[in-house]
Amino acid sequence: ALFYNQIKMANDILNSIPDGTTDPTLLSYRGQAKAIRAFDYLNVAPYFQFKYKGNEEKPCIPLVTEEMAADPNNPRATVQAVYDLIIRDLTDAINDLEGYARKDKSEIDQKIAYGLRARANLYMENWQAAADDAAKAMAGYTPYQRAELTKPMFVSSDESGWMWALEITEADYNADNSLISWPGVIGSFCEGSYSAGVGMYKSINVLLFNLISDTDVRKGWWVDENLHSDNLKGQSWRCLASGDDIATLTVANQGKAAFLPYTNVKFGMYGGLGTNAAANDWPLMRVEEMILILS
């Protein structure tokens, strides 16, 4: 429903903007609307048909644009037609967003539109076009450095490498609804949440853990069989425990269960470990993705 709701909102915005406008504000609205519509179709399409290459003429999803009147007889478009619209929307967005300076990372600017077109070209196996767009998208962004990843991170859009994000505030997720927040489900440090409160931690198994080299910084994103991770060094759970003692800490009334072996400690927590104001931002695009596409 999320993607279709956004498509509807994008179409409403596009219908409200006069053809041929040269107003910079309206151009930024039009560019962002087309980019988000492309983002939505790019996310929905793979659920309803196999990959682009070799399946171009197979049915995918119905397309609804601002130019179409409401019509219940709107059959599934081909994969080719869906991706044609995605590329066309993103190309239009790149043109409309020329020179646009966004207020924060929750908005789409020209580089994000390039990044989305890089994704689309990647899905279509247009390798060189994907690499070219990724290079334009990532200009000026710096990936995480190794030292930054030796502690729980991925909390704020201000962190290295975040290009586009949902910027969450305490008004969106706080102690009253942290149970259903993303750090409360995916992370391990939100007290009283679905994961920490009842011990439903996201983890890997020993086979995968052992495949990760000891020199790979990502190995610290999980505790080992002894509930140790170097990434817990210097960390504190509301002054109740620190370091590896965080793993065995329990807090009454479904506040925190002890970690199990291979529990993830990758994601930090807004306000510090053990808080339940779950206002962690949600990344939608990072520069590391563009580096991977480029390579």
Question: What are the functions of these language-model segments?
Answer:
Residues 52-66, 179:
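Short, flexible, mixed-charge acidic loops at enzyme active sites
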Residues 131-282, 287:
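Hydrophobic-face positions in mid-chain alpha helices that act as interaction patches
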Residues 1-48, 77-80, 94-100, 274-282:
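Conserved, well-structured interaction surfaces
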Residues 30, 37, 44, 110, ...:
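Structural register within alpha-helical repeat arrays
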